[in-house]
């Protein structure tokens, strides 16, 4: 699917250089047909200055003559600027993201590997990738400007946030609505603080007014998974040998928070994968010794294992030689082990049967009394394997730390509720009853303290990811809200947009399949 990407004839000449490649970043080409603006210098909230700072974005639809039919969509943690990739069923004429009525803009957040400044992009001052030296960026760095500050020389300076610079460069005069879920909902709330004269309405799904201790803790556990991978190397790893194991473990942990216990139970229960496809655990051949069978069960699922090693004949701490290399081992082939008996110091008395690993009586694996490999495990491993091919470990660390900075009251008011009361726009809050990450109680809090808010509930057992799964409900709630608060846009006949809207296509990042095809 490719939607028209253009602005009205009144759009000004673009101020910032545009590029179409990012050769230093192996993840850039995962997102198709995106634009990248290069900001010559940009000052972060921390005071750090980024030079030649890239911002990736995509647009859909047409900017009208008054430049005020703009819909900004903000992506979630591992999303990109390609809305079609993760919210495709909602985009197109007559749908919530109506390309015949709105000019839709989605910018990639800093820290993400999909084109904006991140650990994967070049530091122009050194000519090298930032890697672990990429500075902390906040939700506010992405979105809004800070207060006007009186400088030492008496002049006034306003710090503009980076997505606002893109809006200005596209000729946007007013934003009709900002929409985002999860991390994107955090950005949507921050957009509201531009005021109702610039941002007319807000839709926030499955998000919070500030990142909770629960969410901070999950992010920490996921980062520690990455740190524990020896290949992480303080973040100075090469793209040819990244910390896949740690990043995969972090993704597994995250997936458990995106669903609910009941959704996992109903989908998997205690089912096991097809035994005909997995005759031997982690190997392509049966075990040759009882200890090897025990080893296989014990290490099943460990991707970096080196292979079964027969016990040593000495008391030395030196590792004994492996007998074979597992099919999942990342090491080179290893020479066969000695034929020395397992415990020669414990000689068998006369009359005792020969051990089952002898040549005369080859070992036969015993029938296991219970399953040791379940479909739920298979699902997590499969999704982790997909994810590590499309995401970067340093970026995962950077963007989860960005989440930790989120608190709409920080630097604004003494209490959270006072900060929410500052939001003047009509606001739609959508929550999921079974969401254990951004709880429904947090959505109720947003709706209670934002003065012109209304709350909609999604009754789904699918947990947090329901905001990306329950397309019909989300589409209906957003359309109803926009017809209520923006009749001047929704009441007009839409312009013709050449597109293949509604066409089902494969997700380029795998985000759609990860969420819906489980």
UniProtKB/Swiss-Prot annotation:
Chain spans, region Disordered: 267-365
Pathway listed: Amino-acid biosynthesis; L-methionine biosynthesis via de novo pathway; O-acetyl-L-homoserine from L-homoserine: step 1/1
Top-rank taxon: Eukaryota
Biased segments, Basic and acidic residues type: 290-303
Protein's name in the database: Homoserine O-acetyltransferase
Gene: MET2
Keyword Acyltransferase belongs to the record: yes
Keywords: Acyltransferase, Amino-acid biosynthesis, Methionine biosynthesis, Transferase
GO molecular function, one term: homoserine O-acetyltransferase activity
Function: Commits homoserine to the methionine biosynthesis pathway by catalyzing its O-acetylation.
The EC number(s) this enzyme carries: 2.3.1.31
């Amino acid at each position: 699917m490719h939607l028209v990407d253009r602005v009205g004839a009144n759009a000004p000449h673009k101020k910032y250089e545009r590029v179409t490649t990012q050769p230093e970043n192996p993840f850039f080409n995962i997102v198709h047909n995106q634009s990248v603006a290069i900001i010559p210098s940009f000052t972060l909230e921390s005071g750090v200055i980024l030079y030649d700072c890239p911002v990736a974005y995509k647009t859909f639809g047409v900017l009208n003559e008054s430049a005020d039919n703009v819909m900004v969509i903000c992506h979630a943690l591992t999303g990109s600027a390609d809305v079609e990739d993760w919210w495709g069923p909602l985009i197109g004429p007559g749908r919530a993201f109506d390309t015949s009525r709105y000019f839709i803009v989605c910018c990639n957040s800093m820290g993400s590997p999909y084109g904006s400044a991140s650990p994967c992009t070049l530091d122009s001052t050194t000519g090298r990738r930032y890697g672990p030296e990429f500075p902390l960026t906040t939700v506010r760095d992405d979105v809004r400007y800070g207060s006007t500050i009186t400088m030492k020389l008496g002049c006034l300076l306003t710090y503009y946030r980076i997505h606002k610079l893109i809006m200005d460069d596209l000729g946007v005069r007013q934003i009709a609505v900002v929409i985002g879920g999860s991390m994107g909902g955090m950005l949507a709330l921050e957009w509201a603080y531009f005021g109702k004269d610039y941002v007319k309405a807000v839709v926030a799904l499955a998000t919070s007014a500030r990142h909770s201790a629960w969410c901070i803790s999950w992010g920490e556990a996921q980062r520690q998974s990455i740190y524990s991978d020896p290949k992480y190397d303080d973040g100075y790893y090469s793209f040819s040998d990244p910390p896949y194991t740690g990043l995969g473990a972090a993704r597994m942990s995250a997936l458990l928070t995106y669903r609910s216990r009941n959704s996992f139970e109903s989908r998997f229960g205690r089912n096991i994968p097809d035994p005909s496809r997995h005759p031997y655990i982690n190997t392509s051949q049966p075990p040759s010794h009882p200890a090897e069978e025990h080893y296989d069960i014990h290490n099943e699922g460990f991707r970096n294992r080196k292979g079964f090693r027969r016990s040593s004949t000495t008391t030395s701490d030196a590792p004994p030689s492996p007998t074979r290399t597992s099919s999942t081992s990342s090491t080179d082939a290893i020479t066969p082990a000695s034929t020395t008996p397992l415990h020669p110091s414990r000689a068998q008395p006369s009359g005792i049967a020969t051990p089952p690993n002898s040549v005369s009586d080859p070992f036969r694996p015993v029938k296991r009394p219970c399953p040791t490999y379940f479909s739920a495990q298979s699902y997590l491993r499969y999704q982790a394997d997909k994810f590590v091919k499309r995401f970067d470990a340093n970026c995962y660390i950077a963007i989860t730390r960005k989440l930790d900075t989120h608190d709409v009251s920080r630097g604004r008011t003494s209490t959270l509720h006072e900060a929410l009361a500052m939001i003047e726009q009509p606001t739609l809050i959508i929550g999921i009853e079974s969401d254990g990450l951004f709880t429904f109680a947090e959505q109720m809090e947003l709706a209670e303290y934002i003065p012109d808010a209304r709350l909609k509930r999604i009754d789904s057992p699918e947990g947090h990811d329901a905001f990306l799964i329950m397309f019909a409900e989300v589409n209906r709630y957003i359309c109803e809200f926009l017809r209520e608060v923006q009749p001047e846009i929704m009441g007009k006949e839409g312009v013709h947009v050449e597109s293949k809207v509604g066409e089902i296509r494969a997700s380029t990042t795998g985000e759609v399949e990860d969420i819906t095809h489980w």
